[in-house]
Amino acid sequence: MKGRLTAIKNIAWAFAIVICLLAVFVGLLIAAFTRSGEEQFRAVPLGTKTTVKEEVVETGTRPADQSDGTLKTLAETTDAGQEYIDSLVFLCDSTLIGLRDYGILNGGTATTQVWSTPSGVISARDMADSKIVYPNDGSMITAANAAMIVQPKILVISMGNDGLGGIDQFEFMPIYKSLIRSIWENSPNTYIICLPLSSVTVDYAGNDGTTAAKCSEANTWIQTVCEETGAYYCDAMSAVQDPSGVLLQEFASSNGKTLNSTGLNQILQYLRYHAVTMD
């Protein structure tokens, strides 16, 4: 009988020891998880600065996309020569379409230096996504796609005159900015030169709402876009305007808006003496 009681007592002690060990083990687990949770979710006191790690994506070298918030203009230079003019590509609306249609540039009317529509008209509202005639094969593609193929060294943009009367600053600027950025996305090493609007003559009789005052206002929009993107602004149209910004009759075609051959040659001359200096 005594031996049986001793055996029962030993079993009870063993059971108690197991229970104690389990309790210690559970306690250690709880402590470990609590410490981990505190370290992971510890509150940051108000006023404490936290640092968020950002991923930096390199977009490539863009010679003109170096905006510091200032307007980059082209100062007067020595004569860059005909070779410089031959290196330019013009993305233009009806203002400069005579460069192609009058055969003024290298290649005559078949020049590959002018990107525009068959008619030469591109509405200001359609600047960013209008399709142009790709002169190398005659296909209709966007200017951004043409830039991707050609990778032009210098692209001169002369757009915004067509349909200007029906668009305001808040629509014009994002569209113009989108055009520039789409070109750089496809041709990051291209220097972009933006020209102001040529304006209209004092007796312009068009019914599109375009006036000399509206053109002067739009030129400030283009300047702001250049400041924000880093594109160059070249005041070439001053060569064909009077001091008030009105297009001089001697440089205008019969419609009082687009440039005639004399006016176009004035623009080319201005560009020759206000050239981009390559890095």
Each language-model region and where it sits:
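N-terminal secretory targeting modules
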Residues: 1-91, 95-101
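Conserved SGNH/GDSL esterase-like catalytic core that processes O-acyl groups on lipids
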Residues: 78-171
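Loop/turn elements at helix/coil->beta-strand transitions in domains of secreted/extracellular proteins
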Residues: 84-87, 151-155, 187-192, 229-232
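Sec-exported extracytoplasmic/periplasmic mature domains
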Residues: 100, 104, 160, 177, ...
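Conserved beta-strand termini and adjacent loop/short-helix elements that scaffold enzyme active sites
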Residues: 117, 195, 236-239
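Active-site segments of SGNH/GDSL-like serine hydrolases
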Residues: 160-162, 184-216
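Charged helix-capping and loop-helix junction motifs
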Residues: 169-179, 215-218
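Catalytic His-Asp segment of secreted/periplasmic serine-dependent ester chemistry enzymes
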Residues: 200-279
